[in-house]
Amino acid sequence: MQTRNTLSWIREEITRSISVSLMIYIITWASISSAYPIFAQQNYENPREATGRIVCANCHLANKPVDIEVPQTVLPDTVFEAVVKIPYDMQLKQVLANGKKGALNVGAVLILPEGFELAPPDRISPEIKEKIGTLSFQNYRPNKKNILVIGPVPGQKYSEITFPILAPDPATNKDVHFLKYPIYVGGNRGRGQIYPDGSKSNNTVYNATTGGIISKILRKEKGGYEITIVDASNGREVIDIIPRGLELLVSEGESIKLDQPLTSNPNVGGFGQGDAEIVLQDPLRVQGLLFFLGSVVLAQIFLVLKKKQFEKVQLSEMNF
């Protein structure tokens, strides 16, 4: 009987531990991952606003460079590479949601013309597969196959992200034409400053919500601070909460102004966007060009041969 109770107790403890661990993982992952390009899906039907601004900039407030490389022209129903480059100093460390320092992750959103989409695995060459590695791309929406997102992924390994893209064929898709098309890209490195719900992360500056005298700074047991500010005009106490991982710039007894920074800026990342152009080329036009160039070359050859023949005739006449 006692053995049965012991086994039952052990089973309950294991179940409880697994449940708690799972909850901690979900909460931590949500905190760390929020505000990456893939999470814009939750709040925006289209990642590119009418102004041309990509919505990831709403959460990643610092402006950083991003670049995209695509071929100038592609043929219908062919696979090509779109390489997104997200450069940054690999030595940098960012503040994580738990307040510790860690490596930067990166993410990207690629907005292709209608009809262009992620290439199916059986169409991707071994060379491109090697560049992709273990990356897993997703459509922004099930009905928007031309918009792809990736991230967060380790920045030290994937500061260059290769998207395998399948070009459409106007012969089978009447909505596609042989034209020049724009491609838009957005890329970030590091965590955002604002979560999708509008709240601040611990990767940004915290400012004073009122002016006055700092009467008390309480260091919280799990990290972070509670700063008590006494409003000089009415004596009202205001408590500003500072999350863990941030460095204070103020001290007790100090007089501060409204919106004065209470912490240093921990953000070392940022977001950038760019664009490129690609031409969907008609194979018949290419064949026509090749035929024209071949004709020119043949004409030049015949002209040279004719000239040599004429020179021989002239030379023979002079000998007579």
From Swiss-Prot:
<comment type="similarity">
    <text>Belongs to the cytochrome f family.</text>
</comment>
<feature type="binding site" description="axial binding residue">
    <location>
        <position position="36"/>
    </location>
    <ligand>
        <name>heme</name>
    </ligand>
</feature>
<protein>
    <recommendedName>
        <fullName>Cytochrome f</fullName>
    </recommendedName>
</protein>
<dbReference type="InterPro" id="IPR024058">
    <property type="entry name" value="Cyt-f_TM"/>
</dbReference>
<feature type="transmembrane region" description="Helical">
    <location>
        <begin position="286"/>
        <end position="306"/>
    </location>
</feature>
<keyword id="KW-0408">Iron</keyword>
<dbReference type="GO" id="GO:0009055">
    <property type="term" value="F:electron transfer activity"/>
</dbReference>
<dbReference type="GO" id="GO:0015979">
    <property type="term" value="P:photosynthesis"/>
</dbReference>
<dbReference type="InterPro" id="IPR024094">
    <property type="entry name" value="Cyt_f_lg_dom"/>
</dbReference>
<keyword id="KW-0812">Transmembrane</keyword>
<keyword id="KW-0793">Thylakoid</keyword>
<keyword id="KW-0472">Membrane</keyword>
<dbReference type="GO" id="GO:0005506">
    <property type="term" value="F:iron ion binding"/>
</dbReference>
<keyword id="KW-0150">Chloroplast</keyword>
<keyword id="KW-0934">Plastid</keyword>
<dbReference type="Pfam" id="PF16639">
    <property type="entry name" value="Apocytochr_F_N"/>
</dbReference>
<comment type="subunit">
    <text>The 4 large subunits of the cytochrome b6-f complex are cytochrome b6, subunit IV (17 kDa polypeptide, petD), cytochrome f and the Rieske protein, while the 4 small subunits are PetG, PetL, PetM and PetN. The complex functions as a dimer.</text>
</comment>
<keyword id="KW-0479">Metal-binding</keyword>
<keyword id="KW-1133">Transmembrane helix</keyword>
<keyword id="KW-0349">Heme</keyword>
<dbReference type="InterPro" id="IPR036826">
    <property type="entry name" value="Cyt_f_lg_dom_sf"/>
</dbReference>
<keyword id="KW-0813">Transport</keyword>
<dbReference type="InterPro" id="IPR002325">
    <property type="entry name" value="Cyt_f"/>
</dbReference>
<dbReference type="GO" id="GO:0009535">
    <property type="term" value="C:chloroplast thylakoid membrane"/>
</dbReference>
<feature type="signal peptide">
    <location>
        <begin position="1"/>
        <end position="35"/>
    </location>
</feature>
<feature type="binding site" description="covalent">
    <location>
        <position position="59"/>
    </location>
    <ligand>
        <name>heme</name>
    </ligand>
</feature>
<dbReference type="GO" id="GO:0020037">
    <property type="term" value="F:heme binding"/>
</dbReference>
<comment type="function">
    <text>Component of the cytochrome b6-f complex, which mediates electron transfer between photosystem II (PSII) and photosystem I (PSI), cyclic electron flow around PSI, and state transitions.</text>
</comment>
<feature type="binding site" description="axial binding residue">
    <location>
        <position position="60"/>
    </location>
    <ligand>
        <name>heme</name>
    </ligand>
</feature>
<dbReference type="InterPro" id="IPR011054">
    <property type="entry name" value="Rudment_hybrid_motif"/>
</dbReference>
<dbReference type="Pfam" id="PF01333">
    <property type="entry name" value="Apocytochr_F_C"/>
</dbReference>
<keyword id="KW-0732">Signal</keyword>
<feature type="binding site" description="covalent">
    <location>
        <position position="56"/>
    </location>
    <ligand>
        <name>heme</name>
    </ligand>
</feature>
<keyword id="KW-0602">Photosynthesis</keyword>
<keyword id="KW-0249">Electron transport</keyword>
